[in-house]
Amino acid sequence: SWSFRLANLLVGNKVEEAALECQYTGPSLKFESDHVIAICGGDMQPKIDGTAVPLWESILIKKGQTLELSFCLTGARTYIAFSGSIQSELWLGSKSTFHKAAVGGIDGRAIQEGQKISLGNSNSKIGKKIKADVIPEISNNGVWEIEVVRGPNDDWLDNNGYQTFLDAKWKLQARSDRTGFRLDGPLLSFNEKATNKSPEHGYEPSNIIDQGYPIGGINLAGQTPIILVNDGPSMGGFIVPFTVPSASFWKLGQAKPSEYFKFKEISVEEAQDMRSYQTLICSEESII
């Protein structure tokens, strides 16, 4: 996440260090020692002991003080980074929590009420801010433009189905999580490759012999597009006509259920340029 990386940079951590991801509403955290923190992403109206504090800035919270986050005024997810980082073990090279498998993070689960979170030590500075022109712009009208690259199975849709996918506004279902974002929208039409195939591919036009799925692949389960995000399956028997590039994942993470996605087709080269730009701005160059 764009915001996640910037939050870590503000408190002097490496961009990949562990931080807290808060979805829709935030926690109340009482600190047992002084720490520098940064809050980035959706605006959950953060307060320390009842006094509002800014986003996109490194701030000091003292021993005995309480940080409180409310519901998201903008966006869907807020990231809290701590100087010295959350102390957690690597699992397959990551400190992220995979809830459904109960692995990673701290005890393989979401933070529980009353739980203590161990933090490291550092000499981070307060008052560091993210430049205004590199803060991600969170949609305030409930519609998100999401870039997609065609493939790997775009040739299973006919011309009408292909264009319908790009022209439609797709509604994000509440039944969405870090495994997949399910969408509601118009029916899509298929070409002969999908409708006149050998039986081993399956009955539905969107069925295919099991194949590998790219992260960000838009899996077409019958007539339901599902964007396979960070904890999604790595293979299955549905076609993937389009793929969301990694540089657009931050938008997915800030979208709330019942908001809309409008897809914009880009080239592989454009997707690579987006990722390079995002990597560039998620660096010390973006801090003042």
PLM regions and their residue ranges:
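Conserved "landmark" site that anchors the functional core of diverse proteins
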Residues: S1-I288
